[in-house]
Amino acid sequence: MAEVKCSSSTGSPTTNGLVANAELEVKKLQELVRKLEKQNEQLRNRASAVSNCTPSPHLLLQHPPSVVHQSGTCILSSPVLTRPAGLCLPSPVPTLLCTSAVAGSLFSPESMGCFSTNKRLHLSCINAAEGPQNDCPVPGSTLLDEVQVLDLEDGYCSGDEDTWLYVSPTKDQRTFDSSVSPLQWCRQVLDHPSPEIEAAKRSLCFRLEQGYTVKTSHLSPQSSVDSELSTSELEDDSISMGYKLQDLTDVQIMARLQEESLRQDFATTSTCSSVSRPRSSFSLYSGKKLSCSSDQDSDRYSVEEDDEDFDHLPPPQPRLSRCSPLQRGLSHSQTFSSIRDCRKSPSSQFLNGYQQYNYSSQPQTTEQSQSRTNADKLRRSMPNLARMPSTNNNPVVSMTTVRNSQSFDSNLHGAANGVSRMQSSIPSPGQLQQRVHSVGHFPVSVRPPLKATAYVSPTVQGGSGIPSSTSLQSLSSSGIPMPNKTTSAATIGRSALPRPALSTANGSSIPRSKIAQPQRSFLQPPKTLASLSTLRDGNWRDGCY
């Protein structure tokens, strides 16, 4: 600002010049003040506009250069934009872009929410007189109208529809005929396969054959038992023949193992299950034959199978070398049963029921008697080496007698024909008595004998008063009730070498050496009360429990 120098006006010419200059200076100062006032007013209006509207960053858009550099445009200067010469606002200011058409459609209060309807701000430019405000955007236009729209159909996907997919450069382009139906196309591929498909088919067939080979080799559970045979057959023969031979070998091995398991099961379970099977106890007392032959194939037969053999047809030739059934059953069973099994005396109730069971059996046939005679002839060649001096007419067998018969029988039969396994299938006398005792408490009609034509042994007879000795026959005639025993009993001592009696067709028996045999009949007379009381008081006193 120019300094105003006041001086005395004495009328001199210098004084008049100074007054004129002062007036000019005052005018300049007045104009400057007006400019400052206008500038302050604009600043106040601008500040109020900024305080009323705080736009979001997406509104800070830049106008096209043609609009920015027009004379009728009023903007808030920004460091980014180049300010034209006609703009009057200083820098720095906020980066809000606005024009004189703020009240219009550029920043519409309804859409932006910046201004209220009663407080619309009209920004005027300093150079308003130089050009009208027609340079501003047309009312009704928005910023979205200036956005360039991209045409997706033009330039991007206007070509082939498959061009945007990735195509390997090594893959050959095969043209697909759209006129061919999918079924025809599939048939074309199957009828004319490519080398890759042929190789895959061969590989699949090979793998399937390998899987079948492995599966069939492990089908038989017993293939590991005879592995050396199966492997040698597979090595020698082809694959298909190996399967057949292996299956045949497995069948044979399975048959042998089943046969062996049946023998072992019968040997282990016959004595255990005989307690609950009353019918087995009568097969011995009724004179049925028990399987105890010296040949090896008799081991696989049970007691019931022997009964069936001897009920319908005579015994085969290898079984003729059998001793008396009762003697053999008692002597064999003594090898594995202890004396403790024969302690308690059973009641007379089971004797009556047992006799009624025995009476229902029929007498033997002539054919069976002849076979029995042949067996007794063969039995005569085996002397009783365990013979000891006869004791008194005591019906109770002593402990020494039974033990001697045990040792003799086990040594004789164990070393001669090895039927130790079959001995376990014959129940002991203690178990027989126990079973008879358990059956005696049931009604007679509960379980009749299975075989009507039961074979009655002619040698299972003898009075209750026959003197007992250490021989095998002493056990058989020691007072156990027999089905065809008569009421009369002779008490005559035995000879040194006792022999089984030979029975004839008419029922008469040839007496053994120095032993008077009682008369036998095929009809079974009922027991008298005297014989029953003798048995109960004498021999059955030390019965089994």
From Swiss-Prot:
Record GO cellular component, one term: cytoskeleton
Coiled coil stretches, renumbered: 14-53
The record's principal subcellular location, in a coarse class, is cytoplasm
Keywords assigned: Coiled coil, Cytoplasm, Cytoskeleton
What superkingdom does the record give? Eukaryota
Query: Where are the residues of the annotated region Disordered?
Result: 268-342, 461-526
Biased-composition ranges for Polar residues?
Answer: 503-522
Q: Does the keyword Repressor apply?
A: no
Chain intervals with Low complexity compositional bias: 268-286, 466-481
In terms of Pfam families, this protein maps to: SLAIN (PF15301)
Where in the cell is the protein located?
Cytoplasm, Cytoskeleton
Q: Which family does it belong to?
A: Belongs to the SLAIN motif-containing family.
- Function (record text): Microtubule plus-end tracking protein that might be involved in the regulation of cytoplasmic microtubule dynamics, microtubule organization and microtubule elongation.
Q: What is the protein's name according to its record?
A: SLAIN motif-containing protein 1
> Encoded by which gene?
slain1
